[in-house]
């Protein structure tokens, strides 16, 4: 019995070309034949599938709201959690250094692997099979699309707050530390003419920027930062 059979059962697809699945599970630290190209493809396919569902289920929603709802469905946290739920982490092929540093638990690696698998299924069986698999993975979240709130992220809210007051847009200064396989991003957010300066630290640049933006909002007099998300939306 192939050791990938259990994973394919969880994914809901038996690959005709098993090599595609193997590549989708191979991180760049493990060799040249890795999942980066499949991840590139899968990112677009996944975005299209969710966008299509939102378009059909939310006929009254505006373009900006649809974009924010799609982003909340395909952000790194969401994909990493789904990847773990499907047990993809158990099958990842990592280089020795990445393996020792806990790569099988790293959010970005888990999310990228899921997108790569989406790309692999698309190549192996086409869009409709890929759509069926993806919607099955999301489960009840798909049924909730008709109720999903188009929550704005911190960076968008900060930009709107500043534009409404004819103030300059924020500047995000980024400092990167650590090895290539385990980078830490430190982002400082400030606005010319305002006294505030905030910092966000995370393993991805976008989340660090969101954290810094949220903290900046919380310093503003009207409490604009309350109840918003730091998620990478």
Curated annotation (Swiss-Prot):
Keywords: Cytoplasm, Endonuclease, Hydrolase, Magnesium, Metal-binding, mRNA processing, Nuclease, RNA-binding, rRNA processing, rRNA-binding, tRNA processing. One of its GO terms (cellular component) is cytoplasm. Gene3D superfamilies: 3.30.160.20, Ribonuclease III domain. Its EC number is 3.1.26.3. Mg(2+) binds at residues 39, 112, 115. Coiled coil: none annotated. GO terms for biological process: mRNA processing; regulation of gene expression; rRNA processing; tRNA processing. One of its GO terms (molecular function) is metal ion binding. It is found in: Cytoplasm. The keyword Cytoplasm applies. Residues 153-222 form the DRBM domain. PROSITE patterns: DS_RBD, RNASE_3_1, RNASE_3_2. Its cofactor is Mg(2+). Belongs to the ribonuclease III family. This is Ribonuclease 3. It comes from Coxiella burnetii (strain Dugway 5J108-111). The gene is rnc.
